[in-house]
Protein backbone atom coordinates (compact mmCIF):
# COMPACT_ATOMS: atom_id res chain seq x y z
CA UNK A 1 0.00 0.00 0.00
CA UNK A 2 1.54 3.31 -1.02
CA UNK A 3 0.95 6.73 0.52
CA UNK A 4 -1.74 7.71 -1.98
CA UNK A 5 -3.76 4.57 -1.22
CA UNK A 6 -3.44 5.19 2.52
CA UNK A 7 -4.75 8.74 2.11
CA UNK A 8 -7.62 7.51 -0.05
CA UNK A 9 -8.53 4.87 2.54
CA UNK A 10 -8.44 7.45 5.35
CA UNK A 11 -10.65 9.77 3.29
CA UNK A 12 -13.17 6.95 2.76
CA UNK A 13 -13.24 6.27 6.50
CA UNK A 14 -13.81 9.97 7.22
CA UNK A 15 -10.49 10.44 8.97
CA UNK A 16 -9.00 13.56 7.47
CA UNK A 17 -5.50 14.85 8.05
CA UNK A 18 -5.64 17.58 10.66
CA UNK A 19 -4.51 21.07 9.81
CA UNK A 20 -2.77 22.69 12.79
CA UNK A 21 -3.72 26.20 11.73
CA UNK A 22 -7.43 25.34 11.58
CA UNK A 23 -7.23 23.42 14.85
CA UNK A 24 -5.58 26.40 16.58
CA UNK A 25 -8.19 28.79 15.18
CA UNK A 26 -10.93 26.57 16.59
CA UNK A 27 -9.27 25.95 19.96
CA UNK A 28 -7.85 29.36 20.95
CA UNK A 29 -11.17 31.30 20.93
CA UNK A 30 -12.41 28.83 23.57
CA UNK A 31 -9.79 30.39 25.86
CA UNK A 32 -11.11 33.89 25.14
CA UNK A 33 -12.89 34.30 28.48
CA UNK A 34 -9.61 33.54 30.30
CA UNK A 35 -7.42 36.01 28.39
CA UNK A 36 -8.56 39.65 28.37
CA UNK A 37 -5.44 41.59 27.37
CA UNK A 38 -3.50 41.30 24.11
CA UNK A 39 0.13 42.37 23.99
CA UNK A 40 2.72 42.75 21.22
CA UNK A 41 6.43 42.82 22.00
CA UNK A 42 9.17 43.62 19.48
CA UNK A 43 12.40 41.67 19.94
CA UNK A 44 15.88 43.03 19.35
CA UNK A 45 17.96 41.29 16.70
CA UNK A 46 21.17 41.72 18.71
CA UNK A 47 22.35 43.22 21.99
CA UNK A 48 25.66 43.48 23.76
CA UNK A 49 27.05 42.97 27.22
CA UNK A 50 30.16 44.50 28.71
CA UNK A 51 32.51 41.98 30.30
CA UNK A 52 35.09 44.22 31.89
CA UNK A 53 36.47 46.19 28.96
CA UNK A 54 35.40 43.61 26.41
CA UNK A 55 32.13 44.08 24.50
CA UNK A 56 30.29 40.80 23.78
CA UNK A 57 27.55 40.84 21.13
CA UNK A 58 24.65 38.37 21.32
CA UNK A 59 22.24 37.58 18.49
CA UNK A 60 18.62 36.45 18.75
CA UNK A 61 18.04 32.75 18.06
CA UNK A 62 14.72 30.95 17.79
CA UNK A 63 15.78 28.56 20.56
CA UNK A 64 15.94 31.45 23.06
CA UNK A 65 12.47 32.86 22.43
CA UNK A 66 10.72 30.56 24.93
CA UNK A 67 13.14 31.70 27.63
CA UNK A 68 12.66 35.37 26.69
CA UNK A 69 8.87 35.05 26.98
CA UNK A 70 9.18 33.15 30.28
CA UNK A 71 11.48 35.83 31.73
CA UNK A 72 9.13 38.62 30.63
CA UNK A 73 6.09 36.87 32.14
CA UNK A 74 8.04 36.21 35.35
CA UNK A 75 8.87 39.93 35.69
CA UNK A 76 5.27 40.87 34.91
CA UNK A 77 3.92 38.34 37.44
CA UNK A 78 6.20 39.74 40.13
CA UNK A 79 4.92 43.26 39.55
CA UNK A 80 1.21 42.35 39.23
CA UNK A 81 0.70 39.55 41.78
CA UNK A 82 3.52 40.56 44.19
CA UNK A 83 3.60 38.25 47.26
CA UNK A 84 0.94 35.87 45.93
CA UNK A 85 3.22 35.06 42.99
CA UNK A 86 6.32 34.76 45.15
CA UNK A 87 4.60 32.12 47.27
CA UNK A 88 3.60 30.29 44.03
CA UNK A 89 -0.13 30.68 44.59
CA UNK A 90 -1.26 32.86 41.70
CA UNK A 91 0.10 33.87 38.33
CA UNK A 92 -0.98 35.12 34.92
CA UNK A 93 -2.16 32.68 32.29
CA UNK A 94 -0.47 33.38 28.98
CA UNK A 95 -0.40 32.31 25.35
CA UNK A 96 2.18 33.70 22.92
CA UNK A 97 2.83 33.30 19.22
CA UNK A 98 6.05 34.23 17.44
CA UNK A 99 5.69 36.31 14.28
CA UNK A 100 8.78 35.79 12.18
CA UNK A 101 7.75 37.31 8.82
CA UNK A 102 10.59 35.31 7.22
CA UNK A 103 13.17 38.03 7.65
CA UNK A 104 11.17 40.90 6.15
CA UNK A 105 10.64 42.58 9.51
CA UNK A 106 11.78 42.24 13.11
CA UNK A 107 10.47 39.34 15.14
CA UNK A 108 7.44 39.99 17.32
CA UNK A 109 5.81 38.12 20.16
CA UNK A 110 2.03 38.38 20.17
CA UNK A 111 0.59 37.31 23.49
CA UNK A 112 -2.65 37.06 25.40
CA UNK A 113 -2.68 37.66 29.16
CA UNK A 114 -5.33 36.62 31.63
CA UNK A 115 -6.08 35.77 35.26
CA UNK A 116 -5.47 39.20 36.78
CA UNK A 117 -6.21 39.97 40.45
CA UNK A 118 -9.75 41.15 41.15
CA UNK A 119 -8.55 44.49 42.49
CA UNK A 120 -6.09 45.11 39.64
CA UNK A 121 -6.45 48.43 37.79
CA UNK A 122 -5.87 47.79 34.07
CA UNK A 123 -4.82 51.42 33.56
CA UNK A 124 -1.54 50.60 35.34
CA UNK A 125 -0.74 47.73 32.95
CA UNK A 126 1.17 49.74 30.27
CA UNK A 127 3.61 51.01 32.90
CA UNK A 128 4.13 47.52 34.31
CA UNK A 129 4.66 46.09 30.82
CA UNK A 130 7.18 48.83 30.04
CA UNK A 131 9.10 48.14 33.26
CA UNK A 132 9.12 44.36 32.65
CA UNK A 133 10.27 44.91 29.05
CA UNK A 134 13.11 47.16 30.20
CA UNK A 135 14.29 44.47 32.62
CA UNK A 136 14.42 41.94 29.75
CA UNK A 137 17.30 43.16 27.60
CA UNK A 138 16.19 41.18 24.51
CA UNK A 139 12.89 43.06 24.26
CA UNK A 140 12.86 46.39 22.48
CA UNK A 141 11.15 49.44 23.96
CA UNK A 142 8.27 49.11 21.48
CA UNK A 143 5.25 47.35 22.92
CA UNK A 144 1.50 47.58 22.53
CA UNK A 145 -1.46 46.54 24.66
CA UNK A 146 -4.97 45.89 23.29
CA UNK A 147 -8.21 44.21 24.26
CA UNK A 148 -8.13 40.52 23.43
CA UNK A 149 -11.03 39.36 21.26
CA UNK A 150 -11.77 36.69 18.67
CA UNK A 151 -10.11 38.72 15.91
CA UNK A 152 -6.90 38.87 17.93
CA UNK A 153 -6.74 35.08 18.19
CA UNK A 154 -7.35 34.77 14.45
CA UNK A 155 -4.57 37.28 13.78
CA UNK A 156 -1.99 35.52 15.95
CA UNK A 157 -2.87 32.10 14.50
CA UNK A 158 -2.11 33.51 11.05
CA UNK A 159 1.55 32.74 11.84
CA UNK A 160 0.93 29.12 12.87
CA UNK A 161 2.18 26.59 10.36
CA UNK A 162 -0.17 24.06 8.76
CA UNK A 163 1.86 21.09 9.96
CA UNK A 164 3.01 22.13 13.46
CA UNK A 165 2.38 24.64 16.21
CA UNK A 166 6.02 25.43 16.97
CA UNK A 167 5.33 29.18 16.91
CA UNK A 168 2.85 28.90 19.80
CA UNK A 169 4.22 29.23 23.34
CA UNK A 170 1.70 27.69 25.73
CA UNK A 171 2.00 29.25 29.19
Ranges and model annotations:
Residues 89, 104-106, 169:
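Generic detector of bulky aromatic hydrophobic side chains
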Residues 58-97:
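Surface-exposed, low-hydrophobicity interaction/linker segments
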Residues 90-92, 107, 137-140:
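Residue-level signal for beta-strand positions within conserved beta-sheet cores that form or flank
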Residues 93-117:
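Histidine-centered divalent-metal-coordination microenvironment in nucleic-acid enzymes
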Residues 1-38, 46-65, 115-171:
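Catalytic "initiation/cleavage/transfer" segments centered on a nucleophilic residue
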Amino acid sequence: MNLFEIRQRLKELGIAQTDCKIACREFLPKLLHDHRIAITLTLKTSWYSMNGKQKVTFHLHDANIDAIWARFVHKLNKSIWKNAYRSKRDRLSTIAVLEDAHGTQRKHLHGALGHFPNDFDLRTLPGLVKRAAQECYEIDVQHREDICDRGWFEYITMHVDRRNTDNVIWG
